[in-house]
């Protein structure tokens, strides 16, 4: 067999193997996005093991992620110029794109600007970053890695949008 024919045969075998070998969705990086709002009636309380995660009402997450996010504030800072910073930890209970239910934990950092200040003003803008804690995933989020970013949409009622990525391994 000529060298060119052997190479073509090898290439065909490799391509055939790639087409028939299953690629699990869990190995993919999933881009996520959606909206969120606070509602204690929909998200009444954190799961077992996270009893301290009640700094705010439950945060309803809709979109690529469906479920509830619970927060434990660990530190806050504010400045006379109206900057408010908050750090803490969270746990999400829910699913990704209608898949199996599970949980994952995040740490987070929130930054916002208030006018004229935090105590007497109104929020001008806010955002937060939520890296997923490695090894925290259970159920449908076993092996989850990634990050979620939230942005506050300022209006008569503040609403929230998120985007990010989650890799399941």
Model-identified regions with their sequence ranges:
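Bacterial N-terminal signal peptides that target proteins for export
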Residues: 1-9
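Compositionally biased low-complexity segments, especially N-terminal hydrophobic helices
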Residues: 8-12, 25-26
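Bacterial N-terminal signal peptides
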Residues: 10-20
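Sec-dependent signal peptide cleavage junction
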Residues: 20-28
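Beta-strand-enriched cores of mature, soluble protein domains
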Residues: 27-169
């Amino acid at each position: 067999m000529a060298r060119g024919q052997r190479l073509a045969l090898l290439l065909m075998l490799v391509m055939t193997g790639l087409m028939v070998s299953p690629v699990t969705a869990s190995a993919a990086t999933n881009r996520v996005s959606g909206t969120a709002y606070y509602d204690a009636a929909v998200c009444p309380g954190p799961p077992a093991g996270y009893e301290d995660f009640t700094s705010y009402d439950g945060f309803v997450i809709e979109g690529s992620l469906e479920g509830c996010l619970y927060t434990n504030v660990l530190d806050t800072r504010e400045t006379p110029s109206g900057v408010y910073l908050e750090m803490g930890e969270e746990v999400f209970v829910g699913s990704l794109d209608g898949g199996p239910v599970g949980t994952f934990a995040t740490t987070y950092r929130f930054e916002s600007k208030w006018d004229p200040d935090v105590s007497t003003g109104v929020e001008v803008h806010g955002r937060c970053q939520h890296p997923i804690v490695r090894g925290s995933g259970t159920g449908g989020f076993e092996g989850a890695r990634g990050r979620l970013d939230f942005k506050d949409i300022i209006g008569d009622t503040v609403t929230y949008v998120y985007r990010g990525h989650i890799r399941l391994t």
